[in-house]
């Protein structure tokens, strides 16, 4: 093997390893839990999550969560095709969904389980997503769903 072939092979392997580490949809979401009502107190846990959910709150707090807390899930998802994507939350209390920095779902305030949805056009490719949830006391619920052109998107396409 010539010296230039060795260099080219080494560079290719290095680029492949780097691409694997930078894959924005490989790791899912990063969940950060805060023991306060406005994401300002220090976080109590930050863990990767495949899907935003309140199911693991007891795990994050190693027991019952406080009466008031906030959670943010941040990461990326893959839009497999161009289209109008609809995001929906059902939350007890407030929730917000941002796609590529744009507010798509606003379900804020203190309330029982309420659904809110929003639609945004997306081109095929990877998009940033930030999901926020605020619990102000009482019942705890958060559910996220999304779809393209009126049809649900399979979980495997989301990788969030």
Tell me what each language-model feature is:
Residues 1-160:
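Acidic/polar, compositionally biased interaction segments
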